[in-house]
Design a protein with these regions (language model features):
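Long, hydrophobic alpha-helical segments that serve as membrane-spanning/inserting helices
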Residues: 1-31, 35, 43, 64-67, ...
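Long, intrinsically disordered, low-complexity regulatory segments adjacent to structured domains
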Residues: 592-595, 599
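C-terminal functional regions that serve as terminal interaction/effector modules
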Residues: 465-473, 485, 684-686, 690
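Hydrophobic, well-ordered secondary-structure elements that form the walls
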Residues: 382, 474, 500, 566, ...
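Hydrophobic core segments of alpha-helical transmembrane domains
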Residues: 108-113, 153-192, 500-512, 522-537
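Alpha-helical transmembrane segments and their membrane-interface boundaries
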Residues: 1-161, 305, 310, 315-469, ...
Length: 773
């Protein structure tokens, strides 16, 4: 992508306003907390302290809006306390330029590095550094600075208390995550009726798993509907795929296929009903026809083999989902102990060493988080020096704008810079007009500031433009409440905001952290995770007891994590003005399609894992070992820009005995797995041999010239492959059930069909009413 197109796309993204579900009650609660803090501060301490405490309450309320599964009161208290500490330390060093610059560089570096611990911590830390640049100018003594810091902590405590006293959908985010996962599976079941090999985006399941990780206090108060349904939902997906896939299920046509279509439609209706009940905390209302579809005895008479087992398994899992979604007490379907232990979330105190460890692991050359920390600290120092040198008097606007817009990736940094400047112009213009018309006093300015803050809380998820406009107006009214005339803040803020945005954009262009060169590494990590997942699944057939084998569930989760990392990297790379450097967009799309096919085949084999007392399959052990070794070598080849080869897997399949083995699942799945691996090699083999045509030497299309002929091309006059010397067709010596050359591979998309993942949704699926879109 060229720079012009990249700037055009990021500008459009920054100036766009999305339609999102608004939360007026949550916005009203945040504005009420801000009003309480300002009123108390004005009554007892005066306008300057009120402005400082307002910044603390304002930032604490923003922290409660972050997409985090942690309790909201903890976020509010942490935000207010960290801003108070930053303000006090900043004021102590504010009188000495060198000391303050050193503190600013250190604070911004740590804030940039905190993105390694997660986006929530990164956003809170960056916002606190930006707010500190303003709040250190308000106190007039060390004692006053301590008082201002204490009032900022008080603002965070007030917001936390309001969250506890007036909860709005206390478990709403967790309910939405689990309901979105069930709704995504309902949509998947309906799509399988039209496309038996339809892809499935595992992001909703991973989001639900993240939401299921709770602190000990959360685990004690979790609603009964949120216990156990996620684990059941993860087991439903492979059963749906195995029931619909003709490779291991039923034929494409006939009464068996008709029965499978009915079962898939009923499964979609049942999953939608469960998702609706969990989302709203209401009883389950299931269509009677959907339940009757699974209870009819015709299913056992029509289906047989793996399809019959999959149908029975699906009916049992759906029954468990309905019972869990309709549970009103904690005694129904509790999650296993081992799963609860794996999904425990550390408390806020225990999170500190974990976050420090994550930040320490990013201290290596080439880390995108480290490069972001270096960028943001350098820009903050340079911006502060430029703002101080300019004859405006409020030099903190430039570094504040830069720190607020800078993010670890290119598209967000540039789009936020555009939105910041555009929103500042709009907000400042509106605030200036109101000031000139109303000439507000201290209390009216405070009222207008609270109103702007409430509007910002309401529209902050619709886009950066609207949020930045509200923030700009809020700051104008808040500083006006503190005694500064609007004419002293408006012009300089517009100019210095532009300076800060330009510095942020220039810093990323000079010292970037492009994702495009790391695409091969992400692809290799995904391939390696899929190889380990496939080896764990196939190894279960060799040792059904699974005494010393790796856990299939852990391998599956690792593969999903690697897939999400690839999707995020590919999405960022599409917006970067960088050449592909060996992995074009077409090759990346083809490789992604091949890896999705690999994961799907492995999921089908997982759906039919043998019981612990089943007969072992020795050939599966050799195949599992060959697959693990081949994918490790293949991942190394992908990183080194070579084409991976799969001779070890091919040899293991050639030595497969096959007697006493469920051929429709294991052996056929292994063959499909090898085909998908070869598709991956074809996608990465982008070297095309040059073709030279000499106009003075006539030749026919079927007879390449000697200097253009590949080593495996037949000589002129030689019989074509598949025929004898006399031209007669050779008998077909392929194994029964093997696909014909050139035939459509099982699991491959039909000609003209879109590739899986070509248009990935930007977030989790919507409500279950629109799941069949």
């Amino acid at each position: 992508m060229s720079w012009f197109r990249a700037l055009k796309d990021t500008t459009r993204s920054g100036l766009s306003v999305e339609r999102k579900r608004l939360e007026p009650l949550v916005a009203l609660r945040g504005a009420a907390g801000l009003a309480i803090v300002i009123t108390v501060s004005l009554t007892f301490f005066g306008p300057a302290v009120a402005a400082s405490s307002a910044f603390g309450a304002f930032q604490a309320a923003i922290a409660t809006f972050q997409r985090s599964w942690r309790p909201r009161p903890e976020l509010a208290v942490a935000s207010g306390a960290s801003l108070g500490v930053s303000t006090f330390l900043g004021y102590l060093t504010g009188g000495h330029l060198v000391l303050f610059l050193a503190l600013l560089v250190l604070w911004t570096f740590l804030a940039g590095l905190s993105w390694a611990a997660g986006p929530t911590i990164g956003i809170i830390a960056s916002s606190n550094v930006a707010m500190m640049l303003v709040t250190i100018t308000l106190p007039t003594s060390v004692t006053a600075a301590a008082g201002h810091a204490a009032m900022m902590v008080f603002g965070g405590l007030v917001q936390a208390a309001l969250v506890i006293l007036f909860p709005v959908r206390r478990w709403g985010a967790h309910r939405d995550a689990l309901a979105d996962a069930l709704a995504a599976e309902a949509d998947y079941a309906r799509r399988l009726r039209h496309d038996p090999v339809a892809p499935f985006d595992g992001e909703p399941l991973m989001l639900a798993r993240n939401a299921a990780a709770l602190t000990p206090r959360q685990a004690r108060t979790r609603p009964a509907q949120l216990r156990g349904a996620r684990g059941i939902a993860e087991r439903i997906r492979p059963v749906l795929a195995s029931l619909a896939d003709p490779a291991v299920g039923v034929p494409d046509e006939g009464p068996e296929r008709e029965r499978v279509l009915e079962l898939l439609g009923a499964a979609g209706s049942i999953l939608d009903a469960a998702a609706r009940a969990i989302r709203h905390g209401a009883p389950v209302k299931v269509p009677p026809a959907a339940v009757a579809t699974f209870k009819t005895p015709d299913t056992g008479a029509i289906l047989s083999g793996p399809a019959k087992r999959a149908a029975a398994r699906l009916g049992s899992l759906l029954t468990d989902v309905l019972e869990t979604a309709g549970a009103r007490t904690d005694t129904q379907h509790p999650e296993p102990r081992n799963e609860n232990a794996q999904l425990s979330r550390p408390t806020l105190v225990l999170l500190l060493p974990i976050a420090a460890g994550a930040m320490r692991r990013e201290l290596y050359r080439g880390s995108p988080i480290l490069r972001h920390a270096i960028r943001v600290s350098a820009v903050a120092a340079v911006g502060y020096l430029i703002g101080t040198a300019l004859p405006f008097g409020h030099g903190y606007w430039a570094p504040m704008a830069a720190v607020m817009v800078m993010r670890p990736d290119f598209s967000q940094t540039y789009s936020r810079a555009v939105a910041r400047f555009g929103g500042t112009l709009i907000g400042v213009a509106l605030a200036t007009g109101l000031v000139q018309l109303a000439h507000p006093d201290t209390r009216l300015s405070a009222t207008l500031a609270v109103t702007c803050a409430g509007l910002m809380y309401l529209v902050m998820r619709t886009g950066q433009l609207a949020a930045q406009a509200c923030i700009a107006a809020y700051v104008v009214f808040l500083l006006g409440m503190g005694g500064e005339a609007w004419g002293q803040t408006v012009p300089e803020r517009v100019v210095l905001t532009l300076v800060g945005g330009l510095l942020a954009m220039l810093a990323y262009a000079v010292y970037p952290a492009w994702e495009t060169p790391r695409l091969r590494t992400r692809l290799a990590d995904w391939l390696l995770a899929l190889g380990r997942y496939g080896a764990a699944v196939i190894g279960r057939y060799a040792d059904p007891g699974g005494g010393n084998l790796p856990d299939v569930r852990e391998a599956l989760l690792a593969a999903r994590t690697a897939e999400l990392a690839w999707q995020e990297a590919a999405s960022r790379a599409r917006t970067e003005p960088v050449r592909h450097r060996g992995l074009s967009r077409a090759a990346a799309d083809d490789a992604e399609h091949a890896l999705r096919h690999i994961g799907r085949v492995e999921m089908l084999m997982e759906a039919h894992l043998p019981e612990r007392d089943a007969t072992p399959v020795p050939a599966a052990a050799r195949l599992a070992k060959a697959l693990r070794t081949a994918t490790e070598d293949g991942a190394r080849a992908v990183r080194e820009r070579r084409v991976p080869r799969w001779q070890a897997v091919r040899d293991a399949l050639a030595d497969w005995d096959g007697e006493g083995v469920p051929d429709r699942v294991v052996r056929r799945g292994a063959g499909l797995l090898l085909e998908a691996l070869e598709d991956l090699s074809d996608a990465l083999d982008t070297d095309v041999p040059p073709i030279t045509l000499k106009p003075d030497a006539p030749h026919t299309p079927d007879d390449p010239k000697p200097d253009d002929r590949r080593p495996d091309d037949p000589k002129p006059g030689a019989p074509k492959p598949g025929t004898s010397k006399s031209g007669a067709q050779k008998p077909d010596d392929r194994k029964p059930g093997a696909p014909k050359p050139g035939a459509l591979k099982p699991g491959a998309p039909k000609p003209g069909a879109p590739k899986p993942g070509a248009q990935k949704p930007e977030g989790p699926p919507g409500p279950e009413d629109r799941a069949a879109q």
